[in-house]
Amino acid sequence: MGQKINPLGFRLGTTQSHHSLWFAQPKNYSEGLQEDQKIQDCIRNYVQKNMRISSGVEGIARIEIQKRIDLIQVIIYMGFPKLLIEGRSRGIEELQSSVQKRFNSVNRKLNIAITRIAKPYGHPNILAEFIAGQLKNRVSFRKAIKKAIELTEQADTKGIQVQIAGRIDGKEIARVEWIREGRVPLQTIRAKIDYCSYTVRTIYGALGIKIWIFTDEE
């Protein structure tokens, strides 16, 4: 059988870049990793709690972290920043202070910026959240995937592959179903492919969603 490598790690340095940029002594490296994880979890929890409408889509495509000696710069790429910011001018400041409270670094300043993504449904994370929301509402999985593929086609992508595994539609036996639309050249390193795996908890059990989106070729 073909061995599946993670498409993001496979393309690091060519079409993909690291989401965290910092240097540390080997003995402090694990602390830095845990700090990154805490920052990401804290941001996601805050966004979940403070969404303006309960759309079920957080709309976070990715979180980039850059650390210097005296500053931690966090950039949140969101598809729908209005949900968080609209009507709350102090939304970012609140988020900043709640993250700062979580990890007590006195001598480092934390700076959070939110960047809007032009075509949110061209990003697998946002699309996975959309499909997860549909599956939780007991929409049939084929309908959910078809709707998701329609949304990505509007975002000018060249190809998409969606895979769902688990007790689909509450069936007794777990199975894997996948649908591909357009081209998804996983072996071509210069092909810019975005990937995400997402777990959704339904009343029948956990379902795994994997999405590959082929956006461009360099």
UniProtKB/Swiss-Prot annotation:
It holds the Pfam family Ribosomal_S3_C. One of its GO terms (biological process) is translation. Keywords: Chloroplast, Plastid, Ribonucleoprotein, Ribosomal protein, RNA-binding, rRNA-binding. The keyword Lipid metabolism does not apply. It is found in: Plastid, Chloroplast. Residues 43-118 form the KH type-2 domain. It comes from the Eukaryota. One of its GO terms (cellular component) is chloroplast. GO terms for molecular function: rRNA binding; structural constituent of ribosome. Its main location: plastid. Belongs to the universal ribosomal protein uS3 family. Part of the 30S ribosomal subunit. NCBIfam families: rpsC_bact. This is Small ribosomal subunit protein uS3c. The gene is rps3.
